[in-house]
């Protein structure tokens, strides 16, 4: 779930389920990339105000067992930061496109006249709930270093 400051709703928060990837299989790095069009509010909002949060749940991985997905023991990760367009001529754009299209192959066939662009979340803060007792303190560098060493679970 990506949440932005809505330009269409007078600055109200707006949450939207969006496809993402943080690397090609086996080479995840933790930085989420998105393939968005300004026909969608998420891209429009980010171009007006880059502040964004992106929330993931452990539940789709199947590791929560039969626990209610909203139970604190089923981890939830929220990344906050700036959602920015990736320069389409940069090496990062090629990496992001490979990551997105390997996870979501149908993206390659999306309508060209919708002018999809690659965005990335520049992570500034991390909020992790994986048990009772409040969020766990994790810095962006700890998160990204762990993702580089272990392969991020975001891609799974």
Predicted feature descriptions by range:
Residues 1, 15-19, 76-80, 118-120:
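Conserved hydrophobic/aromatic beta-strand scaffold that supports enzyme active sites
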Residues 92-156:
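C-terminal edge-of-domain segments
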Residues 10-12, 39-103, 116:
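Short, structured beta-strand-loop surface elements
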Residues 27-30, 77, 112:
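Short glycine-enriched loop/turn motifs at secondary-structure junctions
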Residues 1-47:
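An N-terminal domain-cap segment
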Residues 32-36, 79, 119-121, 127-128:
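Short hydrophobic-aromatic micro-motifs
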């Amino acid at each position: 779930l990506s949440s932005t400051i809505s330009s269409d709703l007078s600055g109200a928060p707006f949450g939207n389920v969006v496809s993402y990837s943080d690397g090609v299989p086996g080479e995840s790095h933790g930085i989420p990339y998105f393939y968005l069009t300004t026909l969608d509010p998420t891209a429009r909002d980010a171009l007006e105000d880059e502040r964004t949060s992106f929330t993931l749940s452990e539940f789709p991985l199947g590791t929560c067992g039969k626990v209610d997905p909203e139970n604190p023991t089923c981890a939830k990760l929220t990344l906050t930061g700036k959602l920015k367009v990736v320069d389409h001529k940069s090496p990062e754009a090629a990496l992001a496109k490979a990551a997105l299209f390997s996870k979501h192959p149908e993206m390659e066939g999306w309508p060209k006249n919708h002018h999809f662009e690659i965005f990335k979340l520049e992570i500034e803060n991390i909020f992790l709930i994986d048990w009772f007792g409040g969020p766990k303190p994790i810095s962006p560098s700890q998160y990204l270093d762990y993702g580089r060493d272990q392969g991020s679970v975001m891609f799974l």
